[in-house]
Amino acid sequence: SFAYSGNSESVWTGENITSIWKTILINETGSYCVAARPMTMDGAEFNLDLMGYSVSEDQINNDEIGIWNYISVAEMGGVLLFLSYWIWTCLHFSKIIFPAQKVICLYIFLFALNQTLQECIEEYVFSSECIKYRQFYSVYEIIDFLRTNFYRLFVIYCALGFGITRTVPKYLMIKGISIVIALCSVYWISLYKDVYVVSEIFDMIQYEVSPAIWVYSICHLLKQCTSVTTYENASKARFFRRMLNAFIFIFCASPMLHYLSNIIFGNFDYRLSVIIGDLFTFMEKIAFPCYIMFPTHNEALAYNRNVAEEAQEKMI
């Protein structure tokens, strides 16, 4: 309860334990009491509307998850095993490691940090420690934005062959990193100052830029696959074909799996939808870059680049 005395209209904002904000307009002097009442009787069934889909109480509060727990643990275990094997192969071929693979290692670190912060956010989201929640959420948003733009930079550079079959000019890498840092700085300021219009513009641009990057990369890879000269080893052609197939699969499967996940969420079990979403996120964000840049192909690519350079020198 609270008291208000004044001549003009005022706004009182309160917060409950679930971090849901309520706004009450006040234009009269007096004492006020704010309370909440349940919309259903104890034991009654209710359906919660989430993103247009009706989810029953049993789907959300069912403690007997059973097989879903084992599937989630197995999924996470498979991710850790895959990443451990990939990092081990990087260490094994450390003498001929490519710059693109170093970028992937940095990207994996950002992805792991991002997932850790997401777990911290889920821990505080239903608690009263809203300050810690806001801090975790702000850091999570910045790291997620940084990770996403590093991923797009990696896609473009791989399609152009930088750090793989072509050397990376220093100015090009510095420009790319500078652009990413500048975008992250503006995005952070918009979040810190609560300038939501700027963050919404950034989100809108991201939805438009991401498909354009994929289409450009696929078209450039098609050109690369059809322009392999006679002096180049077949390993380069195989590498670009493998990259092209992975790019096309990710670009085509992303909207289809998103639609499938929404159908499962609304009609079957939301936990299955979460597992499918996590699995595809791992495939797109981790397995895809690790697959096209697997360190076991480094020796063949390095030999191929030397052969091509020697052939060009002989022609001159």
UniProtKB/Swiss-Prot annotation:
For membrane topology, the record states: Multi-pass membrane protein
From what organism does this protein derive? Schizosaccharomyces pombe (strain 972 / ATCC 24843) (Fission yeast)
State the name under which the record lists this protein.
Answer: Uncharacterized membrane protein SPAC977.01
From the record, give the transmembrane residue ranges.
Answer: 71-91, 93-113, 171-191, 195-215, 246-266
Positions in the Cytoplasmic compartment: 1-70, 114-170, 216-245
Localization of this protein:
Endoplasmic reticulum; Membrane
The UniProt record lists the keyword Metal-binding: no
Instruction: Give the keywords, sorted.
Output: Endoplasmic reticulum, Membrane, Transmembrane, Transmembrane helix
Which domain of life, per UniProt?
Eukaryota
Provide the membrane-side ranges marked Lumenal in the record.
Answer: 92, 192-194, 267-316
One GO CC annotation = endoplasmic reticulum
